[in-house]
Amino acid sequence: CLSFHKFDMRNCFKKDYFTLCLNIFTSIGYFDDEKDNFSVIKSMAQSVKKNCHIVIDFFNVQNVIKNLVSSEKKQIDDVIFFITRYVEDNKIIKQVRIIDNDLEYSYYEKVNLLELNYFKNVFHKLGIELVSLFGNYSFDEYQENSERLILFGKKL
């Protein structure tokens, strides 16, 4: 039976309960404090049973930096989007300004540039074995220029 729950992903929801825990589409790395990013992976490890798996899907830092589009303008109907991206303080920052007729909105997001070695070190500290590493959603082998960094870990 599939069910959905809202909770803080930095805290373990149910300890040693699940056979698989997923963190997909770069939903980690948004916290300013590194301890919080670590806590997310720790809670994932705590939530799965022994010999069960966690999966983390993150963007590949090298690929993002290499292909970074620093600014662009998009228009959908009468709404105009001005998007700016840049790297600062080991984070990728995206600012979006939206103009909808006479209304103007803006927001920004920032994501830590977490590389493969970061995840390997965290896995080691938490007793997670890195079982597989993929570079895209077709599960092709991870390369330095891969689009994604998809890690399959097993709780020991």
Positions of predicted regions on the chain:
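Conserved SAM-binding strand-loop segment of SAM-dependent methyltransferases
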Residues: 1-14
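A short, glycine/Asx- and small/polar-enriched loop/turn
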Residues: 16-19, 92, 144-149
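A short SAM/SAH-binding and catalytic strip from SAM-dependent methyltransferases
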Residues: 18-35
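SAM-dependent methyltransferase
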Residues: 55-122
